[in-house]
Amino acid sequence: MIVAVFVGLSFAHLLRSDRRPAFFDVLFALAALAGALGFAFGLFEELVPYDELTHAFTTFCVSLTFYFLFYGGAVPERRAVALGTSVFTLGDTVGAYWEIFEWFFVAHYTMADTISDLLVDSGGALAAALVALALRRSGDRLT
């Protein structure tokens, strides 16, 4: 499922290829690779921080994808709060829906695991919102 989500986001991302820096492509590919490797080799269960790091990094990349797809530098100076809030909210929402999907279709993890995943998803979304604000201020360069 995670691969399908990244394929869909990648396709949408390619349609707007003029709206994102090349360095972001590497981050996006690393997030997809981290998720795929985690599922293929059982790294989520084997390595203790792998699940948390992957959740935070993936949410960070997905949230930045929203920024590049929907805003792409078209945000006026006085709309910084709206930009940061929407990038954070979209990323956090994706994390919450992922946890719902995981609960119903993958496995019934403990409540502690679900809560910790939601917290690190929020951290990744917050980091993406801060990066989006910095990119808007600097002119969308991520090099």
Each model region followed by its residue ranges:
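Internal alpha-helical transmembrane segments of multi-pass membrane proteins
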Residues: Y71-G91, T143
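Residue-level signature of transmembrane alpha-helical entry/exit and packing/kink sites
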Residues: F24, E52, R79-V87, D117, ...
